[in-house]
């Protein structure tokens, strides 16, 4: 007989481990190129993380050039106007750190509603409230309010119920030189209405305040009451502060309502989708 042949499995040769890739050291980039790279990072990440990397990065994040580069990417009419304002409306101490444009880019205050919880999605959170009668409650809308983030509303009772927010414009990202530039406007809006079976009254007061919360300008609305049997009437109040006085730093937004039947429960004015929006004047 012939000799037997061994057919054992061939031993596997382990694959060589890949060479570790060398990390890209951004600190070796020229400052001009590093500035371009950082301009593609989200503003909140720049302020919260990139600023902590090293002194060089902190200097770039705290400076003006990075934020002007970010703003320059918006080629719309508002974007171009903002870039012009950012270049011209700077602090007298141009080298002050950190540059206010960082907070401005992170918070994006232009064109968004600065009122928190405008429709009662979070109950009464963010509002300073005074309860009259049986107090404020949140209910679903009886009439659709266009553009509202939620079809819910705040409902008043048989005596005046009041609620208020005071907005700190600098905290929202608007710096003093921009606020005093004469190139912005403040648009306020509120929706109010009634149940079909109960009349109601409504009041609105919006005030522009200085740093000491002294009133510099105001708008008030005192519309006629909505009568009983009204087909769930829903009305819209708007106003634009177009000639902003020097020194405005806060906006106080306050509205109130009650029913006209003096019924226990919640049959009074229904308010929702309140807004305060800062816009750039394009002309």
From Swiss-Prot:
For this record, an example GO cellular component is: SCF ubiquitin ligase complex
Tissue spec. comment: Predominantly expressed in brain, heart and kidney. Expressed at lower levels in liver and lung.
Nucleotidyltransferase is among the record's keywords: no
Q: Is Glycosyltransferase set as a keyword in this record?
A: no
Which GO biological process annotations does it have?
ERAD pathway; glycoprotein catabolic process; SCF-dependent proteasomal ubiquitin-dependent protein catabolic process
Family matches, as InterPro entries: F-box-assoc_dom, F-box-like_dom_sf, F-box_dom, F-box_only, Galactose-bd-like_sf
Which ranges carry the FBA domain?
104-280
Where in the chain are disulfide-linked cysteines found?
A: none
Entry keyword set: Ubl conjugation pathway
Q: The F-box domain covers which part of the protein?
A: 23-70
According to the lineage, what is the superkingdom?
Answer: Eukaryota
Q: Which residues form the signal peptide?
A: none
Pfam hit, one: FBA
Q: For the region Disordered, give the residue spans.
A: 1-23
Job description of the protein: Substrate-recognition component of the SCF (SKP1-CUL1-F-box protein)-type E3 ubiquitin ligase complex. Able to recognize and bind denatured glycoproteins, which are modified with complex-type oligosaccharides.
- Subunit structure, briefly? Part of a SCF (SKP1-cullin-F-box) protein ligase complex. Interacts with SKP1 and CUL1.
Task: Cite the PANTHER family for this sequence.
Answer: F-BOX ONLY PROTEIN 27, F-BOX ONLY PROTEIN 6-LIKE PROTEIN
Q: What is this protein called?
A: F-box only protein 27
Originating species = Homo sapiens (Human)
**Gene it is expressed from:** FBXO27
């Amino acid at each position: 007989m012939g000799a037997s042949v061994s057919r054992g499995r061939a031993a596997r040769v382990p694959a060589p481990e890949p060479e570790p890739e060398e990390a890209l050291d951004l600190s070796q980039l020229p400052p001009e190129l590093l500035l371009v790279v950082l301009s593609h990072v989200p503003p909140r990440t720049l302020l919260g993380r990139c600023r902590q990397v090293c002194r060089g990065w902190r200097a770039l994040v705290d400076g003006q050039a990075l934020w002007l580069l970010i703003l320059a990417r918006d080629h719309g009419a508002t974007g171009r106007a903002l870039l012009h304002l950012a270049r011209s409306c700077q602090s007298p101490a141009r080298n002050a750190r950190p540059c206010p444009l960082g907070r401005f880019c992170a918070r994006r205050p232009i064109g968004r509603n600065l009122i928190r919880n405008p429709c009662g999605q979070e109950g009464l959170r963010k509002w300073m409230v005074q309860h009259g009668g049986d107090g404020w409650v949140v209910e679903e809308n009886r009439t659709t309010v266009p553009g509202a983030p939620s079809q819910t509303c705040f409902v008043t009772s048989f005596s005046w119920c009041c609620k208020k927010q005071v907005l700190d414009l600098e905290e929202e990202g608007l710096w003093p030189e921009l606020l005093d530039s004469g190139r912005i406007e403040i648009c306020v809006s509120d929706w109010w209405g009634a149940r079909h079976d109960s009349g109601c009254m409504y009041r609105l007061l919006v005030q522009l305040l200085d740093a000491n919360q002294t009133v510099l300008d105001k708008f008030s609305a005192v519309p006629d009451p909505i009568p009983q049997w009204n087909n769930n009437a829903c009305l819209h109040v708007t106003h634009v502060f177009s000639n902003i006085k020097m020194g405005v730093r806060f906006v106080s937004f306050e509205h109130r309502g009650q029913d006209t039947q003096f019924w226990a429960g919640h049959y009074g004015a229904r308010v929702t989708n309140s807004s305060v929006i800062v816009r750039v004047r394009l002309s």
